[in-house]
Design a protein with these regions (language model features):
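Periplasmic/cell-envelope proteins involved in peptidoglycan metabolism and beta-lactam response
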Residues: 1-293, 317, 400-410
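Beta-lactam-recognizing serine transpeptidase/beta-lactamase-like catalytic domain environment
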Residues: 7, 71, 218-223, 227-233, ...
């Protein structure tokens, strides 16, 4: 009797478990149907009835502080395709018009279908086949486009530069990658975004908002015209233009001074902190990173041993030189190491224990104001020497160094300035442990 009851309980458990599994499977199948089958069917039905054509906005322009136009747009044309609409055609003729080989054609089609490279791929949705055709190339293709079903021309704009200067400040734009598409739903395969400089920092301001034009198809898939006379179209919104703090005349002059040299020049308006010019040398003409040769030219810049893509004012760490002297003087005064009347002798440089900083000839000895006026290379090393070696003020050398560093940090040394350009590196302020290594 007990065995029979146990058997019935086990049977009920089995039936109940089977029912639960069945319900879960039904739920999963329903989700699959709703998310995959129905969405694909809807995309198929929509693509049969309509062509939703993206309208790309004009990117915002850039001006310098005086109102000079620096960056603007010019028309360009992309070749788009809807994969399911492609029918047999003369690929040789098509390739000759676009100046590509048949092998390149086949590879482009394969890359479009590759969801690893193109996560947003759908045979119902327009895909980028070739970008940035010139007006002449577009005209030739437009005349024969009827021979190539599934392909159409997409109007775009590309950047143009009024001056061959400030490449690393202005930045450049390039095609978005998979990560960009996954992180921002605004982008689709073939879109462009700012990759460096101001173009990157102000991408969301400059790019604008896309629009859409809905075109009606007939039963054969041919475009009949705008759906309901454009009632449902959404016009694009142009990007916002920017007025920079840069003075292009100063920028160009700085680049001229730095030609065939390694280094940088930064000019700052003291009252506002605005950057008037930021020169990095060597540099390059920003116009070489537009058009279909962008990839080739960018690769050449990357391989250049002089590193023209390296923004030295932002990324390199250089000794501050004589610009550091006023800071040193303030620290010495604050700590009571010197007074405004304290003088140091300059024997054409700081030679204590083999010191290296040489100095030009000037009256000696000098107080602080005179040392700043003549940029003396002896006064400030002697001041630091007296501060570090003063056991009356600081019990140890280490404590003296730490106090010195605290003053520097309090004035902003060792921090990023927070300029609106990507890639900035912070400065290095040594402490006593750093000098213990020597």
């Amino acid at each position: 009797m007990e065995n029979k009851t146990q058997f019935e309980l086990e049977s009920r458990r089995f039936v109940l478990g089977g029912a639960v599994v069945a319900l879960v499977l039904i739920f999963i199948l329903r989700l699959f149907f709703l998310q995959v089958v129905e969405s694909d069917y809807k995309a198929w039905a929509d693509s049969n009835a309509f062509l939703k054509k993206t309208l790309y906005p004009s990117r915002g322009m850039m001006y310098d502080r005086t109102g000079r136009l620096l960056v603007y747009n010019q028309p360009a044309y992309d070749v788009m395709l809807v994969m399911r609409e492609i029918q047999p055609f003369d690929t040789l003729d098509f390739c000759q018009i676009l100046g590509i080989t048949k092998e390149q054609f086949v590879k482009r089609i394969a890359d479009i279908k590759n969801r690893k490279l193109n996560p947003g791929y759908s045979s119902y949705v327009p895909q980028l086949f070739m970008n940035q055709l010139s007006a002449q190339e577009c005209g030739v293709l437009q005349e024969k486009l009827y021979k190539f079903p599934g392909f159409y021309i997409q109007n775009r704009t590309i950047r143009q530069y009024e001056y061959p200067n400030a490449a690393l400040v202005l930045g450049n734009i390039g095609e978005v990658n998979r990560k960009d598409i996954e992180n921002d739903p605004y982008y689709t395969q073939g879109d462009y975004s700012g990759r460096t400089g101001i173009e990157q920092s102000y991408e969301t301001y400059l790019r604008g908002v896309k629009g859409v034009e809905i075109l009606l198809r007939d039963a054969h898939g041919r475009i009949k015209g705008r759906y309901e006379e454009g009632k449902h179209d959404v016009p694009p919104e142009s990007g916002k233009s920017l007025k920079l703090s840069i003075d292009m005349e100063l920028q160009a002059y700085g680049e001229k001074l730095m030609k065939n040299k390694l280094g940088g020049i930064v000019m700052i308006e003291p009252e506002t902190g605005e950057i008037l010019c930021m020169v990095s040398s060597p540099t390059y003409d920003p116009s070489i990173l537009i058009g279909r040769q962008r990839g080739k030219n960018y690769a050449a810049l990357q391989k250049d041993p002089l590193k023209p893509l390296f923004n030295r004012p932002l990324m390199a760490q250089y000794p501050p030189g004589s610009t550091f002297k006023p800071t040193q003087g303030l620290i010495f005064l604050q700590e009571g190491v010197i007074t405004p009347e304290t003088t140091y002798t300059c024997a054409h440089g700081y030679t204590y224990r083999g010191g290296k900083p040489a100095c030009h000839g000037h009256p000696s000895p000098l107080p602080l104001v005179g040392a700043l006026a003549t940029s003396c290379n002896s006064f400030f090393p002697w001041g630091l020497h007296d501060m570090i070696d003063s056991r009356k003020r600081y019990p140890t050398v280490q404590e003296a160094f730490d106090v010195w560093k605290e003053h520097l940090v309090s004035m902003g040394y060792g921090y990023k300035l927070g300029v609106d350009l990507p890639g900035e590196k912070r400065g290095f302020v040594p402490n006593s442990k750093f000098y213990d290594k020597f």
